[in-house]
Amino acid sequence: MKRIKCNKVRTVTEIVNSDEKIQKTYELAEFDLKNLSSLESYETLKIKLALSKYMAMLSTLEMTQPLLEIFRNKADTRQIAAVVFSTLAFIHNRFHPLVTNFTNKMEFVVTETNDTSIPGEPILFTENEGVLLCSVDRPSIVKMLSREFDTEALVNFENDNCNVRIAKTFGASKRKNTTRSDDYESNKQPNYDMDLSDFSITEVEATQYLTLLLTVEHAYLHYYIFKNYGVFEYCKSLTDHSLFTNKLRSTMSTKTSNLLLSKFKFTIEDFDKINSNSVTSGFNIYNFNK
């Protein structure tokens, strides 16, 4: 290729001030819409990431059956306790980001009858001779995971009846056979060498994991009140969930915004009629970011 010499040319750009201004109008609504869409996408990503971490954690338990089948099996109390305990530990770590260990002194009771359950509270906590006791309402969890609507449970919103039922439920659950958390913890052999390159899961199965995680998160909020504010405040929170916003706020060591329940905000129209003595109006109990 033949080279051609060219004379060097110097260009000069002059900036001259002018009294004339360029007029440009912006549609703020468009920017607001884009900003909102970006925030929603980011929140959705965080929810998917949290659910993926939860499912990956449960895969280390070497479960012998799918999640729904484990809770359908009445005799498989060991795996039921393992799933619930591991889920509580997972939530505890997200609620306390700097804490890596959860309590290992916990006994589990898997209940089957209505007299040992409270509607809307499939997981309850109490103490039995100084040992923390976790009561798991297996039939209720099965209905939640299989998306069955319970139309037979009797729900009475009178405070006196609620308190009596709570007392009877705790009394009945203490008489059941218990499973200690260390019974399965010592035998658990996490498998971290799984090849997940071809791993796939259906939307129905993912919904079951999400439902269980939200259910146990709800129970963990009660557990936090039980451990930090005592039995009286815990029993009170079972009938008045407005205590969540009063006692569960983010601090230097706790992050309620890490819980999936903090991503939801909803109202129930007839809530004021049901509980006129509530501190808050509406049912915005899961909005921790006030």
From Swiss-Prot:
The keyword Membrane applies. Its main location: virion. GO terms for cellular component: membrane; viral envelope; virion membrane. Keywords: Host-virus interaction, Membrane, Modulation of host cell cycle by viral cyclin-like protein, Modulation of host cell cycle by virus, Viral envelope protein, Virion. Signal peptide: none annotated. It is found in: Virion membrane. InterPro entries: Baculo_ODV-E27. GO terms for biological process: symbiont-mediated perturbation of host cell cycle progression. It comes from the Viruses. Acts as a cyclin-like protein and plays a role in the modulation of host cell cycle. May promote G2/S arrest by interacting with host mus209/PCNA, cdc2 and cdk6. The cell cycle arrest is characterized by an intact nuclear envelope, concomitant with sustained activity of host cdc2. However, viral DNA replication still occurs in the arrested cells. Interacts with host mus209/PCNA, cdc2 and cdk6. Forms a complex with proteins C42 and p78/83. Belongs to the baculoviridae E27 family. This is Occlusion-derived virus envelope protein E27. The lineage of its organism: Viruses, Viruses incertae sedis, Naldaviricetes, Lefavirales, Baculoviridae.
